[in-house]
Every structure is written in structure tokens, then in C-alpha cells.
Amino acid sequence: MGNETVVVAETAGSIKVAVVVCLLRGQNVLLGRRRSSLGDSTFSLPSGHLEFGESFEECAARELKEETDLDIGKIELLTVTNNLFLDEAKPSQYVAVFMRAVLADPRQEPQNIEPEFCDGWGWYEWDNLPKPLFWPLDNVVQDGFNPFPT
């Protein structure tokens, strides 16, 4: 193998890893209304891109702090999904790593630190989630996913 150049077709999309935080408080989960070209005005769990060298737990704690100013107490892996966004202007693929977490201090309240990306945060009952849900979340909910311990 010499100095070979690999060219990726411009039509190929990107593959990213998103860490999704199912933050639980009692029987409620934290959701925000997205302000994004991807899933604008849908309700979503706090989430963000995994950075190089980061663990899933570190990413979840960092993203939650950046978006809501909340601190995680306990966190664990729940499930992983593969999500294709083929109908977008820039097709992409997201591997979504769902993590379950609880607050370090249950008295903490979420702050909307990034209003350019979220209209605000609220606590919602899992059995009565607001609509519309961001489609990757909607898909796992429709498949029977439940972030609460059994």
C-alpha cells in the first residue's frame, strides 16, 4: 500500500454517534422541543454527539450539563438504535446510544442553556408523552421501549 487516496462520493451521507439521555425523576422523563433542521418542533430527550475519546457516560454527563445545567448521579446503558435520515438535505446516519440517568440532586431544575437549539425543557410522564416526538424516539416508544427499571 502506497500513498493511496480514498474518495467518498459526495452523495454519501455521514455517520455519527449520538448519546441520548433518558433522565428520570419519579415517573417522569425530561424532554425538550427541538429547534433544528433535523426534527424541528418535535419533542426529544437531551442528546448530543460523542466526542473522540469520550465514554458514553462522559458524553451523557457533558451534554446534559451543556444543555440543561443538570448534573447526573447514576447512569447506565439502555439500548442502541440505528437511525437513517435519508430524506434530509444532507442524508445522515446516527447510531443512538440511549442511557438512563438520574439527577445527582433531585431538587435541580433544568435551565434552557441553548435556546437556539431548544424551546425549553419539561418533565413528562412516560405514559403520556407530548406529540410530536422526534422520530428516533417515537420509533423506540412504538417498539415498546421503556427507560424505567422493571
Curated annotation (Swiss-Prot):
EC numbers: 3.6.1.68
Domain of life: Eukaryota
Catalysis: reaction(s): (2E)-geranyl diphosphate + H2O = (2E)-geranyl phosphate + phosphate + H(+)
Binding site for Mg(2+): 63, 67
Keywords per UniProt: Cytoplasm, Hydrolase, Magnesium, Metal-binding
Role: Involved in a cytosolic pathway for the biosynthesis of free monoterpene alcohols that contribute to fragrance. Lacks terpene synthase activity, but has a diphosphohydrolase activity with geranyl diphosphate and farnesyl diphosphate as substrates. No activity with 8-oxo-dGTP and dGTP and unable to dephosphorylate geranyl phosphate to geraniol.
Protein name per UniProt: Geranyl diphosphate phosphohydrolase
Organism classification: Eukaryota, Viridiplantae, Streptophyta, Embryophyta, Tracheophyta
Gene name per UniProt: NUDIX1
